[in-house]
């Protein structure tokens, strides 16, 4: 590929080139670019089903990207201010689990709010890491849980100086943000990683007057969801990492 810029769309452009070749498919998916399922073609449109194709050399492979997917990940990392970006399948759940599984091992402690997504708990079950919960305050008027107070994070770190990481929701499901910069700083001062579940904060990277995003705050890893708040189709995610870390992208 030529020089990359933020106006480039490597994967889409590769799909368009492939579509124009009028390849006759003998592989998956079974609808054979709409030929085998006219009802689906009528519902989604011929162009859409023509682009629903399997991994092959012109389109790269997500398991080991070497061309257009790699280029797209590099552009994503640049756009989000991360050192690396990784496109994921399996929802932001898989991105969050990747962060936890790659940061903690059996017996390691991880400090996190009680209102984390269940994907975090699933990851702890898988790898045997030990949760150290911080109970967020509840807004009595709205009836919703708030973010992690920096004082409570400091107490948890003091009581568990051997913890490996701190995980933060940015924002919570209700749009509540913690003091992310201060939490990142505190975690790093105690040689702990800071992981951020940013499933509902993709827009923080591009909007004006937005709360600070994970990469700007110096977090080590963050998981963002492009479909929840980034405007893409359902089930598109990413993981990213900071200057010396990575980004997981759903």
Where do the language-model regions lie?
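Conserved PLP-enzyme active-site core in the AAT-like
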Residues: 3, 11-16, 43, 64, ...
């Amino acid at each position: 590929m030529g020089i990359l810029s933020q106006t480039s769309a490597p994967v889409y452009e590769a799909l368009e080139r492939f579509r124009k070749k009028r390849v006759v498919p003998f592989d998956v998916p079974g609808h054979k670019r709409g030929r085998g399922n006219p009802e689906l073609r009528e519902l989604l449109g011929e162009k859409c089903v023509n682009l629903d194709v399997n991994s092959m050399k012109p389109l790269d492979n997500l398991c080991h990207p070497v061309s257009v997917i790699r280029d797209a990940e590099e552009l994503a990392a640049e756009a989000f201010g991360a050192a690396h970006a990784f496109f994921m399948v399996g929802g932001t759940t898989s991105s969050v689990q990747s962060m936890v599984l790659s940061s903690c091992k059996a017996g390691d402690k991880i400090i996190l709010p009680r209102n984390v997504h269940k994907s975090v708990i699933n990851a702890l079950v898988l790898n045997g890491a030990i949760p150290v919960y911080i109970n967020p305050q509840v807004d009595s008027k709205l009836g919703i849980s708030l973010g992690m107070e920096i004082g409570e994070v400091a107490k948890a770190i003091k009581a568990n100086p051997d913890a490996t990481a701190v995980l933060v929701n940015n924002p919570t499901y209700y749009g509540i943000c913690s003091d992310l910069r201060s939490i990142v700083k505190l975690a790093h001062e105690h040689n702990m990683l800071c992981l951020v579940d940013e499933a509902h904060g993709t827009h923080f990277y591009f909007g004006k007057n937005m709360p600070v995003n994970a990469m700007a705050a110096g977090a080590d890893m963050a998981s963002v969801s492009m479909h929840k708040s980034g405007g893409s189709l359902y089930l598109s995610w990413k993981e990213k990492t900071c200057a010396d870390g990575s980004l997981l992208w759903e």
